[in-house]
């Protein structure tokens, strides 16, 4: 056993092999997300600052799916049969050849645990010079957790299903985090493996065995909020609420205004610049990045979307889109993947835009579908402009050049190009290219004369044009 205060090598194991039957889910418990992050990755993130020599994750149920979400510095170790936490640690020990060191064992269903608490547990273990240390807390509602008794260096943990009525009245609970001296743990694991005589092997049994040889102690959790383990959907919601509040607090401390934290949901991966205002009912998810001085919401849902400085997005949905500096979106717009709005552009009420670039200062103000299109600068699409981009077999592109203007209820049958400065009359159905500077009307559209202001400079036309 290591001497008190010595810094022996640290190894870490996350137990993530269980099914989580109380979740009543087809998905392994540790794969359930909180604020966009799989539960198990919060635990790994708390361990990482301790800089272990190796960080192992024991996988079993849906092993491939769990492996797929693990970060690169986490080493998966397969538990072929889920025979309890004791067997999971035995499997992990087989992957650690070192004889000396400290093994930190953490359950994968505690997403609120902090690196600070893990560091304090480790410090308590090393300074006490004991064989094992377990994290405990006295909880107002200990339902579902093992009860802990400590007596003269021996720690006994009784699972709730095995506890007597008197033991259940004990509110000192095991939180599933341990520090072990490797030699002591290896010996104790062999004893429960050979003598337990039951289907599952409980890691908690090793504490009493180690305590009889070299003492085991407890460390009491200081922040009870971290004791929120996840075993069912209610506990999942409670833990996510706490994480969501932490995320919002962090953004507000960095200069972001959140008008209603109760109705605002921001995932851990989202970035927001200072002096941006987030209005009620807003969801920001995935790789979304919001610049400075933006207004987002109310009732807006953005996923993997970039919003540059000074832009506004209200009552709208964005998926894999980019909103340029000072651009305006909404209300009730839908930006689909591949949409790029350049500086000062606008996509207004009841518009859907997909795989389209909208040039600087161009406007799609209302009631339009624009898909697979390239819109130049200073163009204006009248209400009800539709790009018919799909012929039943292939998607085709529409090009609307700088300064072009479409009247209301215009249909553009792709592939088609509307030339620079061209005008389309209301109700036009365009199935052929329209030359620059011409006015076309009708169904099918035909050129009848020069567009209004065709002989003026483009700047004059831009100043004269009003939004449809």
UniProtKB/Swiss-Prot annotation:
Instruction: Look up keyword NADP and say if it applies.
Output: no
Annotated active site residues, numbered on this chain, are: 366
Region Linker: start and end of each range?
A: 234-254
Amino-acid positions noted as binding acetyl-CoA in the UniProt annotation, renumbered to this chain:
383, 389-390, 426
**Binding annotation for Mg(2+):** 109, 231
Q: What is its EC number?
A: 2.7.7.23, 2.3.1.157
Q: Which Gene3D superfamilies match?
A: Hexapeptide repeat proteins, Spore Coat Polysaccharide Biosynthesis Protein SpsA, Chain A
Which pathway does the record list?
Nucleotide-sugar biosynthesis; UDP-N-acetyl-alpha-D-glucosamine biosynthesis; N-acetyl-alpha-D-glucosamine 1-phosphate from alpha-D-glucosamine 6-phosphate (route II): step 2/2; Nucleotide-sugar biosynthesis; UDP-N-acetyl-alpha-D-glucosamine biosynthesis; UDP-N-acetyl-alpha-D-glucosamine from N-acetyl-alpha-D-glucosamine 1-phosphate: step 1/1; Bacterial outer membrane biogenesis; LPS lipid A biosynthesis
Q: How is the co-factor bound, per the entry?
A: Binds 1 Mg(2+) ion per subunit.
User: Where is UDP-N-acetyl-alpha-D-glucosamine annotated to bind?
Assistant: 15-18, 29, 79, 84-85, 146, 159, 174, 231, 336, 354, 369, 380
Q: Which GO terms describe its biological process?
A: cell morphogenesis; cell wall organization; lipid A biosynthetic process; peptidoglycan biosynthetic process; regulation of cell shape; UDP-N-acetylglucosamine biosynthetic process
Q: Major location, coarse class? A: cytoplasm
| Reactions this protein catalyses | alpha-D-glucosamine 1-phosphate + acetyl-CoA = N-acetyl-alpha-D-glucosamine 1-phosphate + CoA + H(+); N-acetyl-alpha-D-glucosamine 1-phosphate + UTP + H(+) = UDP-N-acetyl-alpha-D-glucosamine + diphosphate
This entry's Gene Ontology molecular function terms read: glucosamine-1-phosphate N-acetyltransferase activity; magnesium ion binding; UDP-N-acetylglucosamine diphosphorylase activity
Q: Which domain of life is it from?
A: Bacteria
- What InterPro entries does the record point to? Bifunctional_GlmU, GlmU-like, GlmU_C_LbH, Hexapep, MobA-like_NTP_Trfase, Nucleotide-diphossugar_trans, Trimer_LpxA-like_sf
Q: How does it assemble?
A: Homotrimer.
Q: Which HAMAP family match?
A: GlmU (MF_01631)
The function of this protein is: Catalyzes the last two sequential reactions in the de novo biosynthetic pathway for UDP-N-acetylglucosamine (UDP-GlcNAc). The C-terminal domain catalyzes the transfer of acetyl group from acetyl coenzyme A to glucosamine-1-phosphate (GlcN-1-P) to produce N-acetylglucosamine-1-phosphate (GlcNAc-1-P), which is converted into UDP-GlcNAc by the transfer of uridine 5-monophosphate (from uridine 5-triphosphate), a reaction catalyzed by the N-terminal domain.
Q: What is the protein named? A: Bifunctional protein GlmU
Source species: Rubrobacter xylanophilus (strain DSM 9941 / JCM 11954 / NBRC 16129 / PRD-1)
The gene name reads glmU
């Amino acid at each position: 056993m290591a001497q008190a205060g010595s810094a022996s090598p640290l190894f870490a194991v996350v137990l993530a092999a269980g099914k989580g039957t109380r979740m009543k889910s087809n998905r392994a418990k540790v794969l359930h997300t909180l604020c966009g992050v799989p539960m198990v990755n919060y635990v790994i993130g708390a361990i990482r600052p301790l800089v272990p020599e190796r960080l192992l994750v024991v996988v079993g149920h849906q092993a491939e799916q769990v492996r797929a979400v693990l970060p690169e510095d986490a080493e998966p170790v397969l538990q072929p049969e889920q025979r309890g936490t004791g067997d999971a640690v035995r499997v992990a020990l087989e992957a650690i050849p070192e004889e000396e060191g400290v093994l930190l064992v953490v359950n994968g269903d505690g997403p609120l645990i902090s690196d600070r608490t893990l560091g304090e547990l480790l410090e308590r273990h090393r300074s006490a010079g004991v064989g094992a240390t377990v994290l405990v807390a006295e909880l107002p509602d200990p339902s579902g957790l093992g009860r802990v008794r400590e007596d003269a260096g021996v720690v006994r943990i009784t699972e709730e299903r095995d506890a007597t009525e008197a033991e259940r009245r004990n509110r000192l609970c095991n939180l599933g985090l341990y520090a072990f001296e490797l030699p002591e743990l290896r010996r104790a694991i062999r004893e429960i493996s050979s003598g337990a005589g039951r289907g599952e092997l409980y890691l908690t049994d090793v504490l009493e065995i180690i305590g009889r040889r070299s003492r085991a102690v407890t460390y009491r959790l200081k922040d009870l909020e971290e004791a929120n383990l996840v075993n069912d959907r209610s506990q999942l919601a409670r833990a996510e609420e706490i994480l969501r509040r932490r995320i919002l607090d962090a953004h507000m401390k960095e200069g972001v205004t959140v008008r209603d934290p109760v109705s605002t949901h921001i995932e851990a991966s989202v970035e927001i610049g200072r002096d941006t205002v987030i209005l009620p009912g807003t969801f920001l998810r995935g790789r979304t990045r919001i610049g400075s001085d933006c207004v987002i919401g109310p009732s807006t849902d953005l996923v993997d979307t970039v919003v540059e400085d000074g832009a506004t997005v209200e009552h709208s949905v964005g998926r894999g889109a980019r909103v340029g500096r000072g651009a305006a979106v909404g209300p009730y717009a839908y930006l689909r993947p591949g949409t790029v709005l350049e500086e000062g552009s606008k996509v207004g009420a009841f518009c859907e835009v997909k795989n389209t670039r909208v040039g600087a200062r161009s406007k799609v103000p209302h009631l339009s579908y624009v898909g697979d299109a390239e819109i130049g600068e200073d163009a204006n699409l009248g209400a009800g402009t539709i790009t018919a981009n799909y012929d039943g077999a292939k998607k085709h592109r529409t090009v609307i050049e700088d300064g072009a203007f479409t009247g209301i209820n215009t249909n553009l049958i792709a592939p088609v190009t509307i030339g620079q400065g061209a005008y389309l009359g209301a109700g036009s159905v365009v199935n052929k290219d329209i030359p620059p500077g011409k006015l076309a009307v009708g169904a099918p559209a035909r050129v009848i004369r020069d567009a209004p202001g065709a002989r003026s400079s483009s700047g004059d036309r831009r100043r004269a044009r009003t939004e449809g």
